[in-house]
């Protein structure tokens, strides 16, 4: 029986080799097949949108990086392996029958090509796969320009830090990786083949091994020299624990920066020492050099800066760091768009100039018509269930949990804000046979309508249990039950069918198959004659009628019906990737997309408007900010919409994008004409972003100042409004974003409102994004911030700074909710209703005053699906006085005196336009018709005190009637309470 040589691999039969080859082919197809299918489908999809240039540019850049980096790393590793193998000793004696090295040698020798070529290729492929994801820094390096601003330390244009430095670090990293792996591989091969021999504490090194290892080690040291050089520049954007700002501080400039230069010089000397061993043949010299470099990095690089920090900077930190804090203040304002030409600060008293309760003050309040007439009583984060119950129409239609705010001009030409939503199809709500593949993807394909509700009014007054008031006043654009386009909304809409939107795209298998193939198939509307269908005629969609298209989409969605179903014909198209934000991210992968996508009627088309940001993470001296943390608030915690956990030090709302809700067309517009980052991307992807001049006037009227950007800016304004570096260091004048008083966690979100224009400082109506800011770790107001969304003043931020005695949102909310009248009323109705306080708005009024407005909503029962909220009261607070009434007008009169609410928008009362009553009549929130008086009886007359006791007994009877569930008894109790209140009012 023949014996196999020690360490040799067994030889496979021809059949075995074929099986192995077939298995490898199958594995490869399983690995790369789905990627090839996705690549082809993406090629089709980008072509349909007109952005195929983006797809090919990204693909070719990734492919080029994969090949270049992979080839470079593979070549260097191959050199390390091949040089060691070629220089191996001719004869290496085995140490014995169990010599492991001899077995490794035999293994390599039996498959030399496999190891010599396969190992470098494998490492190169891995390196290339990782490197191709860095296509953005490479493209920015190739096309990036200047900022026109120089850094304060080195005097270099900021374009070097934004575009060049990341690329240099990328190249250096992969050179270091390649050289390190080559050194390790070279050493291992020399060791296996006897070029390196270890015995006890000593060892021998062949001449080729010494030359090669020294060469690779010397290259690594030279790369470290380059790393020290780049480290100097990266100091300007680094953070350190305990330092209150981003960028190089006193220790960095006076200790770390010189240390980097010293270490650089030592590294050069070390490199010379290493390479000297090629001539001197003495390894002690490079060993001493490397030890010196290691010791120096500990002493000079870490020890010396620590000493300077502890004994020089910390005892005098405010003075030592002031110069660098000033740099950070300026850079942060520049990087986040908070410069003096954008932000205006004005002192604001917080209290009107006229005395409280005076007739003059009431007239001043009423004169602020732009604010008073537009006080928002609908909270878009609360009233979605009312939209669903009253405007859903079909079980498969839906609205988002958090609705949007936009503005339109009403019939009188006045600017008015509206709560808006598109009525989308929700795949998750399809039931039973509706979920069949044909119905799901070819019948239920789209939503129907744009719903708007004026934010400053409701239908009727929720004053009595049997009245159906307090619900939104709906304006609808939709296909009605006669097949005609109903256009009663705030603007005319030609096509209300919604094929693209975030809800319809929420399903994992988000696609619809449309197009003429026989009879109309898509569900459209119903009337007495039955169900009416329609056929999609838009330009969107990828043709799916051919055999190849059917096959690839069948593979993508793992669905055989693509191949066998006769509902797919020659004219069929597939609509997929229908989420507006994801579509924008796909065609502009360099953008960070705002979480607040909203629908708008623009030029008679329904579009989704998406805000896009360009960002950097290495702007010198600019404060590093986490987008996810800065944009998190109480509503994000509830709805889940948030920006990614990304650190940035520069942000611009550089792009406004629209996505057509019918045909899916994506259009990118240049919003910031000065942004160097956007200019670079426009060079990389020419023709993809339209110039700002192409934005239509109608679209301009619907562009909002983006909420996520505003959240980031207000977080930074809380600190970087401070001009003096010493004051900044002490934090004594810092502000902070207040907590939401109506949520268990999270900060108060900013609010869109229509109010008087504080940017122009006149009484014209302006659409603004606003927020209150508290004093640092206190509940008193520090500032009121407003960002204009008006076309003429878009992006201008006004900050009203107020004295420290003005109460903040939490204290105001406490004052309203604990007021005797409010708490008594709430105590009566809360047993049978779910109560929710809405957004607490802060509104400048009456030449110096601040009015706080907080609506109260009631939903019947315990929050089941048939329960939906309506406005029952409006709470107000001004300068220590609380108003609480069924209408804005009455609440204003309570706070400021008669006449203050004269210009407020009254509830609509047309009975014909009232929304339908809830089924069964028992899900209407139970609302007492009167407000009980204060419970205290101090300083009351005997008649008044007796009347008060009657009121309190009547309140108790109302509560008992509620518990009993006897509606007749409850009605009698309410009448008794009404009579008691009348007697109390008339008592003297």
From Swiss-Prot:
Key words, A-Z: Cell membrane, Membrane, Transmembrane, Transmembrane helix
Membrane topology classification: Multi-pass membrane protein
Protein name, entry field: UPF0182 protein MAB_3498c
PANTHER family: UPF0182 PROTEIN SLL1060
One of the record's GO cellular component terms: plasma membrane
Residue spans crossing the bilayer: 19-39, 63-83, 114-134, 176-196, 211-231, 260-280, 288-308
Family under the similarity heading: Belongs to the UPF0182 family.
Claim: Cell membrane is one of the keywords in the record: yes
Organism whose genome encodes this protein: Mycobacteroides abscessus (strain ATCC 19977 / DSM 44196 / CCUG 20993 / CIP 104536 / JCM 13569 / NCTC 13031 / TMC 1543 / L948) (Mycobacterium abscessus)
Subcellular location: Cell membrane
Keyword Protein transport in annotation: no
